[in-house]
């Protein structure tokens, strides 16, 4: 009888222990396990989101770098084009300035030639007058014969 009573009392104590455990101990343990599972799941999800965001950020940074390189090459191309335009404009301006200086120099040379011819005409007229005076053996009055001298200058 002792074994039976002991066995039954042990079974009842075990049943009370199970009831107590299921009633008071098991729910907090399950809540703790579920909270831990939820925390772990959220951590894994956050890790995945972080991974995706890192990939997107990496892709965006690559796009930004490519765009910056493209803009830089465009700016360099525009600068080179503008430099070529400035050089061409300078060449045109220099050519125009050279032409203007050449025209001025030609005009100045023509004026000098005209002045030299005028001086030569006067000298030739003077020589002709001197020659005529020697031929006639008399002095020709320059004032009296100014009209004759002017016509001689015009012919020369």
Swiss-Prot record:
Out of the domains of life, which is the source?
Bacteria
Q: Which GO terms describe its cellular component?
A: plasma membrane; proton-transporting ATP synthase complex
- Look up the signal peptide feature and give its range: none
Q: HAMAP family, from UniProt?
A: ATP_synth_b_bprime
Q: What does the record give as the function of this protein?
A: F(1)F(0) ATP synthase produces ATP from ADP in the presence of a proton or sodium gradient. F-type ATPases consist of two structural domains, F(1) containing the extramembraneous catalytic core and F(0) containing the membrane proton channel, linked together by a central stalk and a peripheral stalk. During catalysis, ATP synthesis in the catalytic domain of F(1) is coupled via a rotary mechanism of the central stalk subunits to proton translocation.
Q: How does it assemble?
A: F-type ATPases have 2 components, F(1) - the catalytic core - and F(0) - the membrane proton channel. F(1) has five subunits: alpha(3), beta(3), gamma(1), delta(1), epsilon(1). F(0) has three main subunits: a(1), b(2) and c(10-14). The alpha and beta chains form an alternating ring which encloses part of the gamma chain. F(1) is attached to F(0) by a central stalk formed by the gamma and epsilon chains, while a peripheral stalk is formed by the delta and b chains.
Family membership, please give it: Belongs to the ATPase B chain family.
Q: What's the protein name?
A: ATP synthase subunit b 1
Q: Which organism is it from?
A: Nitrosospira multiformis (strain ATCC 25196 / NCIMB 11849 / C 71)
């Amino acid at each position: 009888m002792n074994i039976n009573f002991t066995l039954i009392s042990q079974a009842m104590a075990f049943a009370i222990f199970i009831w107590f455990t299921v009633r008071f101990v098991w729910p907090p343990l399950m809540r703790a396990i579920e909270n831990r599972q939820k925390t772990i799941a959220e951590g894994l999800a956050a890790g995945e989101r972080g991974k995706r965001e890192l990939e997107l950020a990496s892709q965006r940074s690559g796009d930004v770098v490519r765009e910056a390189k493209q803009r830089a090459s465009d700016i360099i191309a525009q600068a080179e084009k503008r430099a070529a335009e400035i050089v061409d404009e300078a060449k045109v301006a220099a050519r125009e300035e050279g032409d203007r200086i050449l025209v001025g120099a030609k005009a100045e040379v023509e004026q000098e030639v005209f002045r030299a011819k005028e001086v030569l005409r006067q000298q030739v007229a003077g020589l002709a007058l001197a020659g005529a005076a020697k031929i006639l053996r008399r002095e020709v009055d320059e004032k009296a014969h100014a009209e004759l001298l002017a016509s001689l200058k015009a012919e020369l």
